[in-house]
Amino acid sequence: MGVDVSADAVTAVVADGRGDVVSSVEKPVPNECRSDADRLAQEVGSAIRSLYASLTDDLDLSGGAPGVTALVVGISVPGVVDEDEGCVRRSEALGLQDTPLASLVRQSLSSWAAEVPGLSGGLEVRLYQDAGCGAWAESQWGAAGRDCLYLAVGERISSAVLLGGVPVLGEGWAGQVGRILVPDPDWSGERARLEDVASMCAMVKRHTAGKLDDSAVSFGSGGAAPEPGGCDDASDESFPQCASGLESLLGAIAAGDREARRVWDTGLDCLAELVAQGVGLLGPLDVVVNSELMPADEGAFLEPLRRRVADLVGDLPAPRLVAARLGAAAVVQGA
């Protein structure tokens, strides 16, 4: 089984060797689970039990799944993950730090697993970083080759590098590109985290902040100006708000709004520099961009990103930059 744990939901799937999902379950994560590792582990365990029950019901296997003597569960989470120890070192999205999540989930399932017919081989729970799972799935069944740079751009920005089909782990810290400091395009001389400038939610917030600031100036408001350093936390925006705000931002660009264009272009500039530096370090490997917020029209996002990257790499071979084929399902399928 693969399980993806986000701030909003737990998604669990069973997939076959071709990556096709056989059965799936999705459960919302209550707000009180944030920063409560034991409660979160219970929610993950509940999703796993529901998926197993659903699978056996679908196949009419009331006595258990024949031939299945062990259950192996891969769990993906955002943040810094020590995969060898099964520990979340730090996850802002989940509010966890130094949390042995794999062990907690295993404990939440131990009594249930002992009663599952035929499960003599026991239960194994493994923990993975979400972008690494997405990269591996895209390499196996999606748009990437065995060597790739996987870039997830949504509420946050994270990445993973696969070399020879194997994720580069970096003691759990590999892929935390969203935390890199870049020049803040909204405040001269200041710096901000990449994901507070160039994630989709950050660009929505920057555009909204610009409109509010213009409104305050127009009406002589004494409201406080936003602080430099980008968005305090791009993930404060919910996914529906980001999606709605993205439509507004793209609509403003199409209507000729210069501020909206500046926000979009400066975000793409930062992403292009990241990709170009990756190419300089690793060579022209596949670059796969996965974003639930990416508009269907590649002309707004991927095409200008490709042009910027091609310009920045100079006389180096430009990478093959493509949209993820598996979309939002890549992470849980990889797990």
Q: Model regions: which residues?
A:
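A mobile "lid/hinge" subdomain adjacent to the ATP/sugar-phosphate binding pocket shared
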Residues: 187, 191-288, 294
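Short glycine-aspartate micro-motif
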Residues: 1-4, 70-74, 147-152, 158
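Glycine-rich beta-strand-to-loop/alpha-helix junction loops that act as flexible
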Residues: 71-79, 153, 285-296
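Short, acidic, Ser/Thr-enriched surface-loop or helix-capping motifs
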Residues: 16, 83, 162
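Glycine-rich phosphate-binding loop of actin/hexokinase-like ATP-binding domains
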Residues: 145-201
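Short glycine-rich, Thr/Ser-proximal phosphate-binding strand/loop in the N-terminal lobe
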Residues: 3-46, 87-90, 171-174, 178-185
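Internal alpha/beta domain cores that form substrate/cofactor-binding pockets in large enzymes
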Residues: 261-282, 287-335
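Glycine-rich phosphate-binding loop and adjoining helix at the ATP-binding site
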Residues: 32-45, 49, 53, 66-73, ...
